[in-house]
A protein has these predicted regions:
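Extracellular loop and loop/strand-boundary signature of outer-membrane beta-barrel proteins
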Residues: 18-36, 71-73, 109-112, 147-150, ...
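Internal helix-turn-beta structural module
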Residues: 215-233
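Outer membrane beta-barrel
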Residues: 1-63, 218-223
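Short Gly/Pro-enriched loop/turn and capping motifs at secondary-structure junctions
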Residues: 181-185, 205, 220-225
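Detector for outer-membrane/organellar transmembrane beta-barrel domains
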Residues: 45-185, 192-196
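Outer-membrane beta-barrel "beta-signal"
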Residues: 198, 210, 236-252
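Outer-membrane beta-barrel biogenesis signature
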Residues: 204-215
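A contiguous, mid-protein "functional segment" used to position or interact
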Residues: 192-194, 198-199, 213, 217-221
Length: 252
């Protein structure tokens, strides 16, 4: 049946470890982790309705609200909200998913608030199995960042990724991943780039989800940073890259 989730969360103070000259502190560092234990005054309420069906489509709706406590100066207190819709369809040969999100006074998270900022995100992603051995994954994404008070960083971001994969057996597979991204700024031109990666992989099962995995890869790409070069006042805006290496991936 339909399920409803709701939660309240608080953000803790960030902490950047620094060496201290005070010899009374045995460790001589200000903190030992990436965050402290204090409340920094930023809160969020999150909610999600899921397990809904619209014919063959699975539907999820979520809403998040961010606000500040008195720990934040009155002049800096700000509210933010975010709403999203996820539509997905699963069959024997794969899955397709559409994600739509609108944010007010925030972008990716209602913790990090910016006055008069609106952000829109939309993506289409999925995977398809032609056979058990031949599969492909893909993603199309769009992101619109619009700050009504400061338009110097306003931009539209377009991205596309496709990854055909062939599994020779339960251990060995070959993947070819191609990606393209363009960031179109309202001021100062755009940045764009592409990347192509060929990898030979060793894993414990047949499928892209199996880990741990040992990967040997070669990656080539090019980035044309016209916007960044204009902002920084540099003449060189194009970067070429070729990388060869190996990596080990694992998750639990």
């Amino acid at each position: 049946g339909v399920q409803f989730d709701v939660a309240g969360v608080s953000q803790v103070e960030s902490c950047s470890p620094e060496v201290m000259a005070d010899e009374s502190n045995p460790s001589r560092i200000t903190c030992t982790g990436g965050s402290g234990t204090g409340d920094d005054g930023h809160y969020a309420l999150t909610s999600k309705i899921h397990n809904m069906k619209a014919g063959p489509i699975d539907v999820e709706v979520y809403a998040n609200y961010g606000f500040d406590s008195k720990a934040v100066d009155n002049d800096a207190q700000l509210d933010a909200w975010q709403g999203g819709l996820v539509l997905s369809h699963t069959n024997d040969s794969g899955v397709n998913k559409v994600i739509l999100r609108y944010s007010d006074n925030s972008d990716n998270s209602v913790y990090n608030k910016t006055d008069d900022l609106t952000a829109i995100y939309a993506s289409f992603e999925g995977s398809h199995k032609f056979t058990r051995q031949a599969q492909v994954e893909y993603l199309l994404a769009f992101h619109d960042y619009d700050n009504g008070k400061d338009n110097t960083d306003n931009r539209k971001n377009y991205g596309a990724i496709v990854r055909p994969m062939y599994f020779w057996n339960d251990v060995h597979s070959t993947w070819l991943e191609a990606g393209y991204q363009r960031v179109d700024y309202d001021q100062g031109g755009d940045n764009k780039g592409w990347k192509l990666t060929l990898s030979q992989n060793i894993s414990i099962g047949m499928g892209p989800e199996f880990r741990p995995m040992l990967r040997f890869y070669v990656t080539g790409g090019q980035v044309d940073n016209k916007h960044t070069a204009k902002v920084n006042g540099t003449s060189s805006d194009q970067l070429d890259s070729l990388n060869v290496g190996g990596m080990f991936e694992a998750w639990f």
